[in-house]
């Protein structure tokens, strides 16, 4: 069967890998020049089953209201005359009940556990390297109320098989000595030894190389403009290729893996995908003093930031990512939000990054 994968990010390339392994003829199409150049480019790099509590939870509505208008808020809604944003927002609110939150935690833990297991098997099968670390993920809290609020979800995750252990501030510093600078502010922490971290962009690029060697075709620099139907089925993809020429491509099956842009292609087909773009921010810093930089991947729950450390032949670097801005497809960077991330890094690990 000929399969066309739309999108060369982490999900698109991974789908292409497994489809090729099953014997299909696979073509991947993406508008960027290289795989993994958008959502997968510089994210937080955590493989975090322990991060299973959804944004939509009982405490979220009040927090969102408090954060409205705060440029450096962890979650910033910029209200727009955009029906898709309002529909997504209403769905978000419907999922903030205790019952929905418990259900969604169950679903996320199940999916996350399966995904982590699949990644580990893929690593064994291919030997792929992507600056991965298997030292777990530590969630730390500097607000006692935030810490108390995390205990219930952590217990539910343990009951579901995710070993997210509640630990003291002293135990947190023992696991990650770089937190000693903020020991007086630590209210507590949780630690999941089975969780991992790694460079998502490097993973995608390395897996794409394996796919190409196995016969997967990549058509990069191609702008997908529409999915056309005939007889109630997708008949072909319309695109403008890297040379600016119009093309039609036909397959027996199609994988839509374009992240927040997927709804724009699906909507003309009468398919409404409940997906809305969230703009995240990240900073990557070379490690200046290895003794001051963290080793374990961290989550700062109060500021909604994650921290990963990557080690390669070119040296160590810190990836700090997080916060979310819901502002449609706007790609402009807000300097206030960028500075807030850098400021938090300096508070937690002064002198660690350059």
Which stretches of residues belong to each language-model region?
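Beta1/beta-strand and adjacent pyrophosphate-binding region of the FAD-binding site
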Residues: 1-11
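Glycine-rich FAD pyrophosphate-binding loop
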Residues: 20-41
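Active-site substrate-recognition segment that forms the wall
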Residues: 43-46, 51, 55-95, 180, ...
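Rossmann-like flavin
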Residues: 86-209
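Conserved Rossmann-like nucleotide-cofactor binding loop
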Residues: 11, 34, 261
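Gly/Ala-rich phosphate-binding loop of Rossmann-like dinucleotide-binding domains
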Residues: 16, 20-21, 210
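Glycine-rich Rossmann-fold phosphate-binding loop(s) that bind the pyrophosphate
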Residues: 7-9, 31, 258
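Predominantly flavin-linked oxidoreductase catalytic cores and closely associated redox partners
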Residues: 151, 155-184, 191-277
